[in-house]
């Protein structure tokens, strides 16, 4: 976009450690910097699917330890961008406010398109169309969120209930927490509930106004950042870094949904069906991998061998893995660590991570 047209700036949340995908995803190299499907890293794919918006640049909010890797991703794609390093994780409200503070120094106003770096989108063209609709809502001064049309009764994500309306965007009635199975089935039947994708679009000026209204402690705590110049607000060294550490120490860990979106007016949901998946567990990775005739899966190019196996998945960083006579099992190899797990137990990987941390720090299991 050029001239006096308001700029659209993607803001990508890329700070999570993704420990539920251990041992491949670790604090030193989390999932957003891995190629899980043979199509590029998750962060790379996220940036590329935003290119139809023709952004002049983008912002990546991440941890200081991932700053270099984030700039490397931008360089490979050939798009200008700024990496904002958080001194410590404080959830999505602080990350959004940090990006808004930075953008308010660069532009008179801008449209922030906020999204996580760990999603998979099977229909990028349809996704781009939905993003354009969300940007159009943001230009009206609304806070737009993208809802995914549910395909089945999902209990692992939150939902957005839409109010009746006409057109391609609807007022938000409410945000609802992860339901039980019976409730999820009812949501699917009613047709007015959408999966909460965690993707948003709004004017920088509008979201700053909402922070002042609904999260004034966050807004006040970030005041020193608004006084920094453009270079210092993005710096991860020196006095500016110490200022940012004090700012992040002063705010609670609050999500943008809980802190603002559940309370504010002007909320619009833009529904879409674009093959969305939240890659938060090993079970969810199955959705992005090709399967053989027996339902066994492995990223293209990996040397997995399946003999008499059914519905098994293998992710091998640099070893040949053979699975014989097993079913419904995930095998993951990364470095010197191997995970062997029934698919139904994917939520227990966090327990393994806790034990590994204890062992690595000299504790006992």
What are these model-predicted stretches?
Residues 6-8, 55-56, 79-80, 107-110, ...:
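Short coil/turn connectors at secondary-structure junctions
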Residues 15, 63-64, 87, 115-117, ...:
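Fold-independent oxyanion-binding glycine-rich loops
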Residues 2-6, 205-206, 211-365:
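Left-handed beta-helix
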